[in-house]
Amino acid sequence: MGLQLSGLDASDSDQRELIWAKRPWAAFRGSWVNRLGRVESVWDLKGVWADQAHSAVSESQAATSSTTTTATGDTLPEHPNALAYQISSTDKDSYKASTQGSGQTNSQNTSPYLHLIKPKKVTASDKLDDDLKNLLDPNEVRVKLRQSFGTDHSTQPQPQPLKTTTPVFGTNSGNLGSVLSGGGTTQDSSTTNQLSPVQRVSGWLVGQLPSTSDGNTSSTNNLAPNTNTGNEVVGVGDLSKRASIESSRLWIALKP
């Protein structure tokens, strides 16, 4: 597609193969915002290699068939990760809040995820290049996050009180090792990092939203419950206390 994708090194031969693959989204495993506010992506190179092998088999079978139709990668079924490359829209209806007489705000969940950034499918394949550029643009992602949290008037992502949200931490890709990238989501790694799983969630857990530009906002342990099933996760408040992470963070969950 002629694009150097986020998080990839064009000087590496294996990663060049992914960059120029017909369907690079087959290797896409999720995006997240790191503690510095930078958008990063997780790639599994084996995914695109398997996709290319499947494409080659399909083309070979079509070439030996009696039909005159020429098979290409475009004739393959749509890959489930293709939607992750479309420009996203914010599902504001998945989060509602009600204020009690005491002034405290309680969350009323109508979706498994709060502030969900969900894919919006495009109808024309020729729009994929532009939408991919937009999605991988850190400014575009930050704008979507600010819109999700009702702070689109600000130049920096701003926090909502953690007690009104459902902070979660982890990943289901199984190939991220550091704490900030999702390590510690299993029982063994949680014990190693002195982290105790407090909830479970399904789907992608893809990042954090910096609390303020200076990163000095304190976190809170008053976390809303999450009743989903899936990978073990660690609450943000618990993580901040035990891993000595100074600023409070809210992890955003995406479901492919």
UniProtKB/Swiss-Prot annotation:
It holds the Pfam family Adhesin_P1_C. Residues 56-72, 155-179, 211-222 have a biased composition (Low complexity). Residues 56-115, 149-235 are annotated as: Disordered. Residues 96-112 have a biased composition (Polar residues). Belongs to the adhesin P1 family. This is Putative adhesin P1-like protein MPN_132.
